[in-house]
């Protein structure tokens, strides 16, 4: 993923900015799976590998729908669903509140669906997808597991309410640990500024690993903690 320019890690220099995650925590490292999956070769490779793992996990059972959450999860879930032979693919949409999701697809009672994410940090995003689908289709059935290209949390995070994540890349299992902090963030304490729109200024952010003084003109910053 580093070869795909998908990995940012804070240099340790307080003059360089760091990143705020969607859950509001600060972090000293982040992997933007968008950059990795934008390569069609990577997308095909990851799709095939994910389909193999999820098909094995299903154990002969068939899902009726594959769903992806906005935005990067949609093409990944769609291609994995096609590879698995799942008859229908869908997605949720964000509302005015950046965290809320809605589902516009109607499903018959008893319809089984599988959530496939490109990444999850805590399990909150896939749970919001599941909630949105079940609100629209209370008779549908969510499988007891989801797929994910990459996770930086445990495989049964509390936010996912008991469901298991089947990942391709499990950062904790690989020993890759990026710190997360709340109000006690040591980088904030040292004067490092917090970028809230990292994905929108990604390549500028990568430059700060070598040049901590690099100016990111379109960065949005959180208030100092």
Where are these regions (language model features)?
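Short hydrophobic segments within beta-strands
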Residues: 69, 116, 147-149
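Short, glycine/charge-rich flexible loops or terminal/linker lids adjacent to PRPP-binding catalytic cores
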Residues: 71-117, 121-128
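Conserved acidic residues
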Residues: 64, 111-113, 144
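Active-site-facing substrate-recognition patch
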Residues: 1-59, 200-203, 207-225
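Short, well-ordered alpha-helices that flank and scaffold nucleotide-derived cofactor binding pockets
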Residues: 52, 56, 82, 131, ...
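Short glycine-rich phosphate-binding loop at a beta-alpha junction
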Residues: 60-70
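Residue-level preference for short coil/turn positions at secondary-structure junctions
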Residues: 62, 108-110, 181
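PRPP-dependent phosphoribosyltransferase catalytic core
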Residues: 1-3, 130-225
């Amino acid at each position: 993923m580093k070869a795909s320019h998908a990995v940012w890690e804070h240099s340790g220099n307080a003059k360089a900015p760091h990143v705020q995650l969607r859950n509001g925590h600060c972090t000293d490292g982040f992997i933007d799976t968008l950059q990795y999956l934008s390569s069609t070769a990577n997308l095909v490779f990851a799709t095939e590998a994910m389909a193999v793992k999820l098909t094995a996990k299903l154990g002969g059972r068939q899902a009726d729908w594959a769903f992806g959450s906005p935005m990067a999860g949609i093409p990944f879930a769609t291609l994995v669903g096609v590879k698995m032979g799942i008859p229908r693919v869908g997605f949720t949409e964000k509302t005015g509140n950046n965290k809320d999701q809605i589902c516009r697809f109607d499903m018959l009672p008893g319809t089984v669906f599988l959530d496939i994410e490109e990444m999850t940090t805590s399990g909150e995003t896939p749970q919001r997808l599941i909630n949105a689908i079940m609100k629209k289709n209370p008779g549908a059935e969510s499988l007891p597991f989801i797929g994910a290209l990459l996770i930086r949390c445990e495989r049964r995070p509390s936010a996912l309410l008991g469901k298991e994540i089947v990942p391709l890349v499990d950062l904790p299992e690989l020993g890759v640990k990026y710190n997360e902090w709340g109000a006690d963030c040591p980088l904030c304490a040292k004067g490092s500024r917090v970028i809230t729109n990292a994905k929108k200024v990604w390549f500028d952010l990568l430059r700060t690993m070598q040049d901590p003084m690099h100016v990111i003109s379109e960065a949005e910053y959180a208030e100092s903690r």
